[in-house]
Amino acid sequence: MALRQIRLENDPILRKKSREVEKIDDRIKQIVEDMFETMYENKGIGLACVQVGMLKRIVVIDMQDEDGKMVLINPKIIEKSEEKQINIEGCLSVPGKNGYVERPKTVVVEYTDLNGNTQRVMGTDYKAHCFCHELDHLDGVLYTDKVLNLSEEEVERLNNEK
């Protein structure tokens, strides 16, 4: 396993669209291991492959919950709720900053696992935010593109209205 360098927000690679993974081989499995090690070392809960400089549609997530460590290869959101929520987000590629972002309250993600099987997972509340945030990276979008200019009180009021 090896730590990889996290690309920062001014790196042009973060604005590029990642490519589908065609074959899950030992190299892909090594990249995934390195991504987890890098994510844990930097105290993150999610990491997209582009954040370590490779344009591959791979995301790793570990929210320390019942789903445990997740590897999502070629993920896509196939369902999302009309109901929205606003939550605070940060990013390992944008250190020292955070901001409020509106995202669907619930999403269903279809992806390929490390064994080549198609899977589906539902994320609600903060997990939905995490899925959307990481999948945005695969399309060259940073959370900072979506930040709302709201106070904490405004966010609480808006979330309670829903």
From Swiss-Prot:
The residue range of the signal peptide is: none
Active-site residues per Swiss-Prot or TrEMBL entry: E134
What EC number is given for this enzyme?
3.5.1.88
Report the enzyme's class at the first EC level.
hydrolase
Q: How are cofactors bound according to the entry's free-text note? A: Binds 1 Fe(2+) ion.
Query: Looking at the keywords, is DNA damage present?
Result: no
One of the entry's Gene Ontology molecular-function terms is: peptide deformylase activity
User: Per UniProt, which keywords does this protein have?
Assistant: Hydrolase, Iron, Metal-binding, Protein biosynthesis
Q: Which domain of life is it from?
A: Bacteria
Give the GO biological process terms: co-translational protein modification; translation
Indicate which residues the UniProt annotation says bind Fe cation: C91, H133, H137
Cofactor(s) essential for the protein: Fe(2+)
Q: What is catalyzed by this enzyme?
A: N-terminal N-formyl-L-methionyl-[peptide] + H2O = N-terminal L-methionyl-[peptide] + formate
Task: Outline what the protein does.
Answer: Removes the formyl group from the N-terminal Met of newly synthesized proteins. Requires at least a dipeptide for an efficient rate of reaction. N-terminal L-methionine is a prerequisite for activity but the enzyme has broad specificity at other positions.
- NCBIfam families reported in the protein's UniProt record: pept_deformyl, PRK00150.1-3
Q: Belongs to which family?
A: Belongs to the polypeptide deformylase family.
Write down what this protein is called: Peptide deformylase
Q: What's the source species for this entry? A: Finegoldia magna (strain ATCC 29328 / DSM 20472 / WAL 2508)
Q: State the organism's lineage.
A: Bacteria, Bacillati, Bacillota, Tissierellia, Tissierellales
